[in-house]
Amino acid sequence: MIITIGGRSGAGKTSVAHTLARRLGYRFYSMGDLRGRMAMERGITIDELNEIGKKESWTDKEVDEFQKKLGKKEDRFIIEGWLSFYFIPHSFKVFLDVNSEAAAKRIFKNQRPDEEPQESAREVLKMVKKRMAESQKRYRKYYGVDCFCEECYDLVINTTNLTISQVVSKIITELKIWKSKNKTRQEKRRKKK
């Protein structure tokens, strides 16, 4: 079983994915962290890496290939990333949403080392909106996919007023239902053959 977690910045994707992985005993991968390491290894910020990505596809392709291979080779893991649902289509796909104000406060409180430091939640919100719009445009250009299209996911949760534990519990409950439905579909396909 593979679970992919996407969604809006500040929705708690990494925290939820990490907690869920611990609860299920699964491995955890973060594509945001991987891109952040790529940027830091080159002595630049994630936003500078994204700026390069507007003209050079290698900034995305390396991470994207990693996800594709992972989805083919491994099982029992949770992967957090904006395009993970796309590169691992047989996964249980979760989208985490959040309102802008809550997202800005969360991100401001937990600023990342691969990002330019921000002085206020308002600055964070401006930076996040810009990054999300640029990433969305880049992914449409390279793959023709909208990473924020909720219809692409099996489960959508608004995390604005929920704790990490509440979100994880909802995912586990819905995962059981999804697995049951998929098992029934697979059995029907086998009978038709």
Stretches found by the model and what they are:
Residues 137-138, 154-156, 166-193:
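C-terminal accessory "lid"/substrate-recognition subdomains
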Residues 31-88, 101-104, 109-116, 126, ...:
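ATP-dependent small-molecule kinase phosphotransfer cores
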Residues 22-29:
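Post-Walker A helix-loop "phosphate-sensing" segment adjacent to the P-loop in P-loop NTPases
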Residues 8:
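P-loop (Walker A) phosphate-binding loop of NTP-binding proteins
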Residues 5:
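Hydrophobic anchor at the beta1->P-loop junction of P-loop NTPases
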Residues 116-170:
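Small-molecule kinase domains that catalyze NTP-dependent phosphoryl transfer to phosphate-bearing small molecules
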